[in-house]
Amino acid sequence: VSQTSLLDCGVTWRGIGLPEANAALEAWSHKMGGMHRPCAADVAAHGLLHDGRLVAVACTAGLIRETVAGAPWLNRGNAVELARLCADRTSLCRVALRLWRVFTFPTFGRAYAVSYQDADLHSGNTYRFDGWQRVSFARAGGEDRRSGRKARNKWVWVWPPQNTKQSP
């Protein structure tokens, strides 16, 4: 009788190059596209692979602004941003988020992780079911200065969850 170990299922979580992550984000039609921030040295990409094929991506970056919209206690000194989370099938986003939170986020040495989520496109369940807390709402106005696209309303999620919306 042959038995397959869970360790033999061909699944790997590891750092990947930004070009590989960007190619996947584009191929999977992520609404924000690839990670093209001015300070590329401040970006890290990780991937979930199955039998050597990339099936999910998580990109981490430093905060663009000094503080997080609606949560000024979150800043460049104490937080990193999970800037992209995408998979070739949606059910793998939860898996990638959990792997990122448990294994990748602690390597950045910051107290908090934040993620901005499009309020019109997403229900928030991916973050909520992983234990994240929604801490603020960023209302968009006009155009995104970086992309020229119409700005979008965003929910701001934080890990670890806080008791209040104010500074812990």
Predicted regions and their residues:
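Short amphipathic alpha-helix that is part of the acyltransferase structural core
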Residues: 1-40
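Acyl-donor binding region in acyl/amide transferases
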Residues: 15, 61-153
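Short secondary-structure junctions
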Residues: 30-36, 133-137, 167-168
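A short helix-loop-beta-strand connector motif used in the catalytic cores of GNAT acetyltransferases and
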Residues: 35-53
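Short hydrophobic/aromatic beta-strand or adjacent loop that forms the aromatic wall/cage
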Residues: 43, 152-156
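Conserved beta-strand in the GNAT
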Residues: 47, 52-69
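Short, well-ordered beta-strand micro-motif
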Residues: 47-49, 156-160
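Hydrophobic helices that insert into or interface with lipid environments
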Residues: 150, 162-168
